[in-house]
């Protein structure tokens, strides 16, 4: 119900069709999105079954958050048809999607994938090389790992860490990202000055880097207890409703300023109507 508040123009509503088999679902489809559980053997079986029934021209994309396309393509009859298109939840409000082809995927297929994604209101970011966990989840993993250490070492609570993000740098990141935030911090001299001034800090032992805390029962219990207290009795559905309302408000504000995700959404009124050409 939030989507109409974000997009100016939407195509006419379609119909959700439930199928009894993968073959029925993919026959004649132009785009097929695989979203099975994050286990390589399950995905490979599903992808093989998809390719048995889909047309050769179809794009078969995986939502995998961790596997590289070359891993998914192992044993595939048509590996050049498979790529990764990794979105972020809630998919209906966050426009970004990581497109990850392997070396065997033709450039024409990549360009067609980018075009189709743009036509449905997504912002495709095509990575220059495949890597486990792509880009977004690697950044999130680094922050998550450090947060677990801060809780394990008794430095901060889950609520304090979330407050630091929601009341601080998270607000900057939502509109400027990481590098442009630091470029601004460098003053009129820009990024070069920032790197010269703060670059040496990278040598300081501030973080745990790649060390992973042991998620033993004690740490799990501590996180769960603090998170439950932070939720204050609100259900997951209530938290999701609050999240979506906040995202819509933020996207509207970014649209008004014509920046970041808002600038992208401002250009989407016309492209979204292009869905009709894919439904002919």
Describe the function of each predicted region.
Residues 59-129, 133-137:
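Rossmann-fold dinucleotide-binding core
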Residues 11, 76, 165-168:
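A general structural motif at alpha-helix termini
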Residues 138-143:
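Short acidic alpha-helix initiation/capping motifs at coil-to-helix transition points
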Residues 122, 126, 153-280:
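NAD(P)-dependent Rossmann-like dehydrogenase/reductase catalytic/cofactor-binding core
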Residues 50, 130, 149, 163, ...:
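Short, flexible helix-loop junctions that flank or precede catalytic/ligand sites
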Residues 2-59, 67:
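Rossmann-like NAD(P)-binding element
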Residues 118, 144, 148-157:
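C-terminal regulatory/interaction module of P-loop NTP-utilizing enzymes
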């Amino acid at each position: 119900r939030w989507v109409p508040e974000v997009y100016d123009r939407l195509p006419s509503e379609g119909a959700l069709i439930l199928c009894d088999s993968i073959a029925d679902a993919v026959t004649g489809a132009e785009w097929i999105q695989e979203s099975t559980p994050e286990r390589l053997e399950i995905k490979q079986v599903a992808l093989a079954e998809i390719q048995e029934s889909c047309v050769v021209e179809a794009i078969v994309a995986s939502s995998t958050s961790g596997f590289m396309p070359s891993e998914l393509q192992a044993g595939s009859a048509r590996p050049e048809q498979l790529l990764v298109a990794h979105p972020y939840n809630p998919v209906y409000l966050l426009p970004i999607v990581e497109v990850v082809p392997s070396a065997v995927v033709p450039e024409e297929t990549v360009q067609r994938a980018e075009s189709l994604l743009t036509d449905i209101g997504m912002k495709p970011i095509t990575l220059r090389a495949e890597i486990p966990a792509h880009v977004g989840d690697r950044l999130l993993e680094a922050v998550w790992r450090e947060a677990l250490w801060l809780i394990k070492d008794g430095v901060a609570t889950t609520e304090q860490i979330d407050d630091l993000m929601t009341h601080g740098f998270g607000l900057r990141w939502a509109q400027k990202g990481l590098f442009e935030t630091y470029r601004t911090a460098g003053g009129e001299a820009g990024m070069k000055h920032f790197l010269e001034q703060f670059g040496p800090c990278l040598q300081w032992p501030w973080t745990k880097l790649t060390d992973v805390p042991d998620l033993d029962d004690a740490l799990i219990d501590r996180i769960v207890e603090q998170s439950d207290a932070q939720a204050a009795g609100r259900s997951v559905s209530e938290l999701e409703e609050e999240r979506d309302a906040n995202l819509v408000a933020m996207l509207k504000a970014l649209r008004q300023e014509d920046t970041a995700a808002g600038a992208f959404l401002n250009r989407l009124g016309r492209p979204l109507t292009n869905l009709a050409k894919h439904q002919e």
